[in-house]
Structures are given as structure tokens and as C-alpha cells.
Curated annotation (Swiss-Prot):
Assembly mode: Monomer.
Protein's organism: Prochlorococcus marinus (strain NATL1A)
Region (Interaction with substrate tRNA): 38-41
Family: Belongs to the IPP transferase family.
Gene assigned in the entry: miaA
Protein name as catalogued: tRNA dimethylallyltransferase
């Protein structure tokens, strides 16, 4: 299948919603490759905790944007957009269509919504100083510098608050003003999955992660990249590290990971509802509904 005009199909949804399996089924039917739009699966050695597609799954369909960067050299949104756009355009030249899959809403928006993030590298000294400030005070500071971003970023989301402040102090410009929109050179079809049993799916998948070796994977990351690796704050890895350090036990690590993942899923659903115009698929008939939408879109 090769459409007359390049087509990007974006399959989005909260974490643990079954996107990976559905994407593979869709890709097989329409003979497309898959681009994983995930802010963590792009890193080498972070497999179990990011629910990265397995080697068997990746052997069924070509997957791109997986295992691209070292955890010790994290990239920002601008870097990801540049890497991903090059890969997507190369794929579109060959096949005429491709499939994006992910739960990282901002990363998806950067690719299919024409978002143009600021090319401001992390400011290490400034970031270290900001991390010493209480979250409440950080958010108050952001309100003074960039009121619009302060409205959009949750007071507890210190990572995004610090990033917005970095951009302001490095450029003198508001993060919200820097993110201009530019036209994208392809057509986009947005599909979404949001199963009713999401919470039980999250619980089951989290338990599987720990059983498959999340603790051991975290230990390997610490041994390879150091105990202060920033990406160890990621959901799952953070709890595993706390358990390794003796701060919490196994049951507490599991419980906290499930709780944080449910909170993430809630934020993701809110983002997709407000920022995208997806056709939401019925979970029981997701594949036929997705294929029907794709064929209708292609005309």
C-alpha cells in the first residue's frame, strides 16, 4: 500500500493501553514500518522499565527510534524531533506511509502538530540550582517569568517547570512563546486507544516488569552509568533504585510504581483529549476499526 501523498498514521493512548500489540497488527496489514514516539524507549539499556517492544515483536515489523541514545547522554525535545523527523521522512520516501506509536504527547505533537520546540541545551549549573528549590516556590517563580507556561504545567511537575525556566534564563524569552508552529509536509491520521480496564492493565504490566527483572535492570544501569543518572528518576526505575538503596521494600516499590503510572496515564488522557483529534477505537474491535479508518482516509 502506497498512497499518492505521504501519510503518517499516529496511534496514541495512555501507557499500558495495548498500543504496541495493536501497532504491530496494523503495520502487518498495511505493510508499514513503526516509529516509536517515546521519550524513554529511545535509550539503550532501558528495556523492561520502558515496556520497550521485545526482540520478537521488533522482528515482526521494522521499528525505528528505539535504542538510539545512551542514557548518560539524554536528549531534549528539539533533538528528538530532529532525529525522528529525519527517520520519518526517509521512510515516507520509500513507502509513502508510516505508523507512529506513542504515549509521549508532547513528542507526538512536535512531529504531527508542527510544534517547533526551542533549541536550548540543558543548563547544568542553573538546573542544579533550581533543583534545590521547593516545587511550590519553583512554580511561583515560573508564574513571574512565564505565566502562560505556569498555567499549563502542573505545580508538581518540577522537570517541565525547570525546563521552562532554563529556556527563559538562557534566552530571555518565554518557553510558551518559543514553541512556534510550523506546517508539516505530510497528511496525518490520528487514532487512539483507551481501554476501560486500563487500571487493571497497569497493575498487571507493572507486576510483570518487576518479575521480568526491573530491579536487576536498574542495578545494571547504576553500575554502567552511575547512581546519579537522571533517567533513573523515570517511573519504575526510581522505585527500584529506592528499593536497592534499602529505602523501601518490594511491596512498597510495586505499589508506588502502580500509583505513579496511573497518575501518568491520567495526565496522558487529558493531554490527548485537549491537544489531539483522534478517532478513538473500540478496544474489542480496535484492529478492524483502525484499518477501516485508514482505508477510508486513503480513499
Amino acid at each position: 500500500m502506497q498512497p499518492n501523498k505521504p501519510l503518517v498514521i499516529a496511534l496514541m493512548g495512555p501507557t499500558a493501553s495495548g498500543k504496541t500489540e495493536l501497532a504491530i497488527d496494523i503495520a502487518k496489514k498495511i505493510n508499514s514500518n513503526i516509529h516509536n514516539i517515546d521519550s524513554r524507549q529511545i535509550y539503550i539499556d532501558m528495556d523492561i522499565g520502558t515496556a520497550k517492544p521485545t526482540a520478537v515483536q521488533q522482528s515482526q515489523v521494522n521499528h525505528f527510534l528505539i535504542d538510539v541514545c545512551l542514557p548518560s547522554k539524554p536528549i531534549n525535545l528539539h533533538d528528538f524531533q530532529s532525529i525522528a523527523q529525519t527517520s520519518i521522512e526517509r521512510d515516507l520516501e520509500k513507502k509513502g506511509l508510516t505508523l507512529l506509536v506513542g504515549g509521549s504527547g508532547l513528542y507526538l505533537q512536535a512531529l504531527i502538530g508542527g510544534l517547533n520546540p526551542p533549541a536550548v541545551p540543558p543548563q547544568k549549573f542553573l538546573r542544579d540550582q533550581l533543583k534545590k528549590i521547593d516545587k511550590t516556590e519553583l512554580h511561583k517563580l515560573l508564574k513571574l517569568c512565564d505565566p502562560f507556561s505556569a498555567q499549563r504545567i502542573h505545580p508538581e511537575d518540577s522537570i517541565r517547570i525547570i525546563r521552562a525556566l532554563e529556556v527563559f534564563y538562557a534566552t530571555g524569552k518565554m518557553f510558551s512563546k518559543e514553541k512556534n508552529m510550523t506546517p508539516i509536509p505530510w497528511r496525518v491520521l490520528e487514532l487512539g486507544v483507551n481501554p476501560e480496564n486500563l487500571i487493571s492493565r497497569i497493575q498487571r504490566r507493572t507486576e510483570e516488569m518487576y518479575k521480568k527483572g526491573l530491579i536487576e535492570e536498574t542495578e545494571d544501569l547504576i553500575n554502567k552509568y552511575g547512581k546519579n543518572l537522571q533517567l533513573l528518576k523515570t517511573i519504575g526505575y526510581g522505585e527500584a533504585r529506592s528499593m536497592i538503596n534499602g529505602k523501601i521494600n518490594y511491596e512498597e516499590a510495586l505499589e508506588i510504581t502502580i500509583k505513579r503510572t496511573c497518575q501518568l496515564a491520567k495526565r496522558q488522557k487529558t493531554w490527548f483529549r485537549n491537544k489531539h483529534h483522534s478517532k478513538w477505537l473500540n478496544n474489542e474491535n480496535a484492529l478492524p476499526e483502525a484499518l477501516t479508518s485508514i482505508y477510508e482516509f486513503l480513499g
